């Protein structure tokens, strides 16, 4: 009985497209050589670079993503669900006066750290007649109490 050599194609076994395990390298003598087997207890330069990148990202959680050499950015793509820190909520003075009591509840309910910034409106554009009717005249306090109940934010 003749001995047959059992061989298999490692390229068909490897499902990852970026994997190089099925590619053969050649020595100077021309003999094909398999790349070394990965062993988790042996630290390579690639492992060190990956570990340093993770540490850097964790040490600066609010840093904006940096550009890579090919122009792409790492991290979440800016969109309607992602925030870029610091987050500022821009309120006009009348809105701030109206929502003064509920500002803390709003910031507690907001999913990220935020700051309320008061924006000065152009007097020609602002329509304060609606807001003036909602306030009582109380000149000894900094904020004006409300006449009507504002909605409660959960």
From Swiss-Prot:
InterPro entries: Ripply_fam. Pfam families: Ripply. It is found in: Nucleus. Transmembrane segments: none annotated. Disulfide bonds: none annotated. One of its GO terms (cellular component) is nucleus. The keyword Nucleus applies. It comes from the Eukaryota. Residues 85-119 are annotated as: Ripply homology domain. In the late gastrula stage, expression appears in the dorsal presomitic mesoderm and in the first three pairs of nascent somites. Expressed strongly in forming somites and then expression is rapidly down-regulated except in the first somite pair where expression is maintained for a longer period. Also expressed in the presumptive notochord and in the tail bud at the 48 hour larval stage. Expression disappears by the 72 hour stage. GO terms for biological process: embryonic pattern specification; negative regulation of transcription by RNA polymerase II; somitogenesis. Keywords: Developmental protein, Nucleus. May play a role in somitogenesis. Belongs to the ripply family. This is Protein ripply. It comes from Branchiostoma belcheri (Amphioxus). The lineage of its organism: Eukaryota, Metazoa, Chordata, Cephalochordata, Leptocardii.
